[in-house]
């Protein structure tokens, strides 16, 4: 997820052919310059007006017990189910995992099977200065759940 800080508030940052700017569902973070589109508010913003721009990614540690398969799994809010996390492997089919499509399989694990988690920030801009900085923080699973909730509700 791409995040931008504008006037001290965090927003999702959209940068594609259709639009460029910040979006939020939180009306309290908007002013008259935001355009309402369904339940979202959008404001075209130039990157020079943003104090921070960064990508945030969430990972959990789960050892699938298979040689050559990483134990760190990238997850998003969409991967969170009722007290389970859906892991996706897109480099082939793993034994005992559910086939989703060609060379893609999934497995659901219980929250209590997660021993460690981390959040990764890939900064493009910090405090108004262009920077290329990667920062990783190891956190508890509960802290990661709180972070995922916080960032998905920007």
Each PLM stretch: what is its role?
Residues 1-154:
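Short, surface-exposed polybasic-aromatic patches that bind anionic ligands, especially phosphate groups
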């Amino acid at each position: 997820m791409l995040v931008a800080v504008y006037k001290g508030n965090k927003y999702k940052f959209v940068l594609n052919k259709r639009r460029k700017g910040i979006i939020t569902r939180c009306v309290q973070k908007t002013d008259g310059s935001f355009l309402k589109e369904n339940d979202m508010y959008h404001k075209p913003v130039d990157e020079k007006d943003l104090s921070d721009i960064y990508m945030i990614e969430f990972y959990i540690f789960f050892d699938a017990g298979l040689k050559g398969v990483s134990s760190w799994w990238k997850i998003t809010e969409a991967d969170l189910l009722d007290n389970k996390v859906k892991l996706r492997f897109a480099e082939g089919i793993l034994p005992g995992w559910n086939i989703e499509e060609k060379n893609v399989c999934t497995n659901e694990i219980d929250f209590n099977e997660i021993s460690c988690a981390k959040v990764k920030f890939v900064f493009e801009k910090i405090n108004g200065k262009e920077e290329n900085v990667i920062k990783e923080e190891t956190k508890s699973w509960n802290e990661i759940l709180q972070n995922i909730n916080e960032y998905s509700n920007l």
